[in-house]
């Protein structure tokens, strides 16, 4: 029997912008970085976008985009931040989806409800809005309709599936 494994990356960071300043303020707990988005981007997102493959002598042989080999979703608020603050990582995520389509016929990326709201607890209108906004943001960034959607905290009920 052939067996398969699917590794899925769920990438989400909440919006950290101060709405009065329209800027992310310094977060001391993220030191030495300015804020947690920057720290996580430098320590996690960028290294996976440009992962080093070493040769037998420990020298860099090539760089690979790990995102092209996994299933992943990136929250719309994080994608917006990446587009502005780490455009190389944003583009690597979009390119990973293109590479997966070329290799397998199916994209690696899936959508996520827009604001990470627990959809079963939302009103019907808010639930539909979260799903529509998440799907639309995905279409604008990845250039295709999503084939699936990551549900925040994997919370699900029948009305959520119907949304």
Where do the protein language model's features map onto the residues?
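Carbohydrate-active enzymes and regulators
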Residues: 1-163
């Amino acid at each position: 029997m052939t067996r398969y494994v699917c590794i899925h990356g769920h990438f989400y960071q909440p919006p950290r912008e101060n709405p009065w300043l329209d800027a992310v303020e310094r977060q001391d707990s993220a030191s030495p970085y300015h804020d947690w988005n920057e720290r996580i981007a430098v320590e996690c997102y960028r290294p996976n976008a440009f992962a080093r493959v070493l040769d037998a002598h420990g020298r860099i042989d090539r760089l690979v985009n790990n995102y092209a080999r996994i299933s992943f979703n990136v929250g719309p608020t994080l994608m917006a931040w990446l587009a502005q603050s780490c455009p190389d990582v944003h583009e690597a995520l979009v390119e990973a989806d293109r590479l997966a389509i070329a290799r397998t016929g199916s994209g690696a990326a899936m959508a996520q409800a827009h604001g990470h709201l627990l959809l079963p607890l939302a009103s019907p209108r808010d639930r539909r809005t979260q799903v529509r906004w998440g799907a639309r943001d995905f279409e604008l960034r990845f250039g295709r309709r999503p084939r699936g959607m990551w549900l925040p905290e994997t919370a699900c009920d029948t009305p959520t599936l119907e949304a």
